[in-house]
Amino acid sequence: MIQKKIFSRITSPLVFIAVLMFVTLSASCKTEDEKKLEALFANGNYPFTNIQGEAPEVADFILKNKEAFLLDLNYVLQNNHDDLFVIADKSHFLEKDYKPSDVLPLEKNDDYVFYRNDLSLRTPAEKALRVMGQAAKNDGITLVVSSTFRSYDYQKIVYERNVKQMGQAAADRESARPGTSQHQLGTAVDFGSITDEYAETKAGKWLAANAMDYGWSLSYPKGYEAVTGYRWECWHYRYIGKPACAFQKKWFKNVQQYMIEFIHNWNQLSIE
């Protein structure tokens, strides 16, 4: 209707054609991502886990604010220079030899503490960890790094040990099978005691309140075991970058799993 009113006032054929081309091109530029977005949510499907029943609410919010969502999404993807959104969970496996080339041993520093000599992280994660560690230190908090990168083979040892100690079902709530661990990505860190009690420590409380400001996201939040596949882990954070943390908080109920699954499915989908 709006286009008809505009065109009715145009007398020059050349101007009419120019306006028509502009409208057509503008529409096509906008609709490619919109079509992709709608395809991901088509037929009652969701591009992330819906076990908690939150997907309809998240989907409704996104689809009612497509333009703003797509602007944020494209900003996050365009600034993902370090490939920080690789998915690793109980449904998505990493290859046995998967190891990013920039995984390097941790070096003693003044920003955080570690007591093992076999710890390593990807370079962007380690740099961000130093920044966060310094910020915590300024607040009188010392961050203790307890576990970082794990190879496929090392994770196999950890998982099999847990199965032997606690049984299959309990181990699957506590420990990732080889190829499904975020630790193999080289961007995940376990802090402190690696126990539930860590949440009540000064460091645990500081991380819960501030980690996202430095690009670190809690991977397994309380109440989302059905979504993540793992029980609450107050000590386990994954570096995804500050833009992605803000994106997760704004659009995905602050649940990392929802956002990572969405980005994975977005990247997999192509619209002809």
Q: Can you name each region flagged by the protein language model?
A:
Residues 1-8:
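N-terminal secretory signal peptides that target proteins for export/translocation
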Residues 10-30:
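Sec-dependent N-terminal signal peptides of Gram-positive bacterial secreted proteins and lipoproteins
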Residues 29-148, 152-272:
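Extracytoplasmic cell-surface/polysaccharide-interacting catalytic and binding patches
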